[in-house]
Amino acid sequence: MRLRLFLAASALALLSGCAGLTSHEALEGQGDAQTWKTHKQQLSELDAWQIDGKVGIRAPRDSGSGTLFWLQRQGYYDIRLSGPLGRGAARLTGREGAVSLEVAGQGRYQAESPEALLEEQLGWRLPVSHLLWWVRGLPAPDSKSRLTLDADSRLARLEQDGWQIEYTRYAEQNGYWLPERLKLHGQDLDVTLVIKDWQPRQLGR
């Protein structure tokens, strides 16, 4: 009888542990959960920024590097790439439901999502909607994720929707600890972002 009770209790404990892993966020690593929660709340309120940096892209058919400019104003974004993959300049602008892509020497294209545009015109399967969160060092809130925290309770590694993101360097800007270098690995695309200048702002208050 005692053995049965022990086995039943062990099974319940195992199931409880598995249930925890299927929640929206599964936390691992050295960091403190409460400190991460506070850090996450602060960054979630950040709804505007300007980024200048470099981007490296490796895809099955081509690869290269270029410069990155990213202007975010709440739901509106303006992302510009110059020089990657020998394509010249590309500019992605839009908000939810209305997105435009301009490619130098090719023209202007429109779609309802940035993911559809980039895959159709450039062949890149890149979750831009998630990038709005990942670039701040946060998981996207609408799907499950596995988080590994560093000793400072910031993201060291993120796994979400088939992507792995590694955060190797942070810097403090205007009271926010923000990623300076991150590597994104997808099924057929690798992206490295090196951010030279972060200008974070809050517009929603």
From Swiss-Prot:
CDD domains xref list: LolB
Function description: Plays a critical role in the incorporation of lipoproteins in the outer membrane after they are released by the LolA protein.
Name of the gene encoding the protein in the UniProt record: lolB
The UniProt record lists the keyword Lipoprotein: yes
HAMAP family given in the database record: LolB (MF_00233)
Membrane topology qualifier: Lipid-anchor
Subunit structure: Monomer.
Lipid-modified residues, N-palmitoyl cysteine kind: 18
InterPro entries, A to Z: LolA/LolB/LppX, OM_lipoprot_LolB
Keywords (A to Z) from UniProt: Cell outer membrane, Chaperone, Lipoprotein, Membrane, Palmitate, Protein transport, Signal, Transport
Protein family membership: Belongs to the LolB family.
Compartments reported by the entry: Cell outer membrane
One Pfam assignment: LolB
Organism expressing this protein natively: Pseudomonas aeruginosa (strain ATCC 15692 / DSM 22644 / CIP 104116 / JCM 14847 / LMG 12228 / 1C / PRS 101 / PAO1)
GO biological process assignments: lipoprotein localization to outer membrane; protein localization to outer membrane; protein transport
Signal peptide interval: 1-17
GO CC term, one of those recorded: cell outer membrane
Lipidation (S-diacylglycerol cysteine): 18
Name recorded for this polypeptide: Outer-membrane lipoprotein LolB
